[in-house]
Amino acid sequence: MSYVDEVIAQVVEKNPVQPEFHQAVKEVLESLRVVVEANEEEFRKNALLERLTNPERQIMFRVPWVDDKGQVQVNTGFRVQFNSAIGPYKGGLRFHPSVNLGIIKFLGFEQVFKNSLTGLPIGGGKGGSDFDPKGKSDREIMAFCQSFMTELYRHIGADTDVPAGDIGVGGREIGYLYGQYKRIRGVYEGVLTGKGLTYGGSLARKEATGYGLLYMTREMLKENGIELAGKTAIVSGAGNVAIYAIEKAYQLGAKPVTATDSTGWIYDPEGVDLEALKEIKEVKRARLSEYTKYRPNAEYHEGKGVWSVKADIALPCATQNELQLEDAKALVANGVIAVCEGANMPTTLEATQYLQENGVLFVPGKAANAGGVATSALEMSQNSERLSWTFEEVDAKLQQIMINIFHNLDDAAKKYGKAGNYVVGANIAGFEKVVDAMTAQGIV
């Protein structure tokens, strides 16, 4: 059995009932075979793959809080500090009922490579809770966030671990979390990113993941002799990533025609009305079914099916494993030329392989959605310097970071004879930097 197969088997055995984590490890290690085989003796001796797939620290804790009826509720909190070889742990917090240790480990593992790809000095981590913010009052969300931070504060710090937002954690939640951290610690430091502009946040942070996704898509298409302008795009999701991906798509001359939420999806052949979408999701916090009140000629469909829409480009921006094999077949049949992941691992392994085998250009989330964490790191820099950069400065830095990420992964793929395979390129480019740092720092 090869070293890669041994480590994959160990991960599955030691981490039962964590399919998302198994999937993430398998996808990364399979694509690293060519590098591992060239360095197998050294990697085995130093147990590099075992150390890479085992988090440095896994924290689980109880989160008690009181709802508006006076009833005590209890949720579980998580923080997985996966790898700090190249910098302090950095990664978001996710509040969603599906959250468990396996999902947080998969997200933290992916974050290690994503953060490495940015070229910035940040390690990988992830956290969250099975708390569901949907349907909760502001007071209940504040109570939960304060209780969550009352334990989490012990494990984080501006030079140790800097969380950010993710699904279910936006500006409101970051504000409540930051307020409680400051109250407990009595220090004003950049311990969270995604903060409000009045208390240390960065301009362009909210837009960064969606904008970065489109900068990556444009650069990848350009490398392949294709113009983004004039293309039609399927976008899934209706949160932060999707909304600002749609906004930047319009700015770059493309036409996004869909959006989705947990109940259904919209198809607007004239192009999604961005202002209507923002009002529904950011102001009203309502369901997408409201959209047809703004645009009577648009279609609303309950359930799934967005990948059946005919378009040139697909941008999955909702959640893990949303794009499955049958969806990939529909995309190929409809002539899609590129898929770029705005969410974390939204495409299953089988779907990814099918897309690649059928000549679809494919950029994985760890590269395509790295704009969010890159701009979080820029927020950390501004906090450290006690400065605030303009929107244009941050956006220009973000654009250059995304261009650099693409060319780094493109070069890595070509170096190992895998030209055009951006999954392999992203994993190799992220892996090499982390492994070099781990080796230099010894067995720790």
Residue ranges and their predicted role:
Residues 41-71:
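Structured beta-strand/loop patches that form or line metal/cofactor-binding pockets in enzymes
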Residues 193-196, 201-310:
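Glycine-rich phosphate/diphosphate-binding loop of Rossmann-like nucleotide-binding domains
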Residues 19-22, 38-45, 119, 156-165, ...:
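Flexible, glycine/charged-enriched surface loops at secondary-structure junctions
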Residues 264-362, 367:
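Rossmann-like adenosine-cofactor binding region
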Residues 96, 115-229:
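Glycine/serine-rich phosphate-binding loop and adjoining beta1-alpha1 elements at the start
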Residues 2-19, 24, 220, 332-444:
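Adenosine-phosphate binding glycine-rich loop
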Residues 2, 16-23, 27, 43, ...:
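Conserved active-site and cofactor/substrate-binding residues in soluble primary-metabolism enzymes
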